Amino acid sequence: MFKNDEEYFADKEYISNSMIGDYLKSPAYYEAKHVSKIIPKQSSPAMVLGLALDCMLTEGLNVFGMTYSKQCLKRDNPELFEQNKTGAFEVLTEAAWNQIHTMAGLIEELPLYKEIKDKADKQVILTGQFGTGYKVKGKLDFLVVENDTAYIYDLKTSSVIKPIQYHYHCLDYGYYRQMAMYKNLVIQNYKVKKVVCKHIVINKDPWWNKCSVFTLNEDRIDKEMNTITDTIRNINAKAFDEVFEEHEIGEEKEASTFGLKEIDLL
């Protein structure tokens, strides 16, 4: 379907989780970014860090080396300095370059990563349909299919890594919704009855790195299905008028609402 990342991210016919997130942020923002295209594509330092880490761990050092380069001064490395000016590479600061290598090294020591790195399909692009023919897409970091069970593993960098805080982080960033999309796409494309969804998470503190693996609760994931369907329906209906919202805040949530479990630590 999509030959490369450029085609995948440029396509607007198929709806992705990140596009749904943009609509939920603001219908008018979605229209400006994906329809009128007056908002340029932007990458925050956190996004660059996460994408570079994904590249190293899912596509390997060779691809990483053809995609990314380390920033340097001309007097320190004239050849690399000129190479970086060509625009052929995503140039990372020395701090980001070192941090990515440190984070990747820690993840590579994780027992779960050692278990899946050779048997998993990596950077798996899937397409399918939601509801009454709405086209959707997703890109999975790792996918393992064993008999009638599929295992989705997604790499995440995060400023929080404890279970309760990470649960709310998942809510803020739409990660349960993302896994609902992925789960549905896997079921459409593979003959499986069960899908297990896990996050391999490393905190992005430059001075202290720690890994955790979280299993996302299946019921909590499934709760996102209505949100996905309703949002895609609104996008296809071109419902881009801004909606005024009023909320009451401060209610304490019960622990039973937490949707994940920490299963492995380094």
Question: Residue locations for each model-derived region?
Answer:
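Metal-dependent nuclease catalytic cores that hydrolyze phosphodiester bonds in DNA/RNA
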Residues: M1-G138, E246-I249, K253
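Short catalytic/ligand-binding loop motif for oxyanion handling, primarily in non-cytosolic enzymes
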Residues: G65, V160-P163, W207-N209
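Metal-dependent nuclease catalytic regions and adjoining charged, substrate-binding loops involved
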Residues: E94-A104, L171-Y176, M181-L266
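Hydrophobic/aromatic-lined pockets within catalytic cores
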Residues: L57-L61, T157-V160, I187-K191, N236
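Secondary-structure boundary elements
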Residues: L110-D118, V144-Y151, V186-V195
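A residue-level signal for conserved active-site and pocket-lining positions in enzyme catalytic cores
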Residues: L53-D54, F142, I228
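Non-catalytic protein-protein interaction segments used by genome-maintenance enzymes to assemble
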Residues: I125-Y176
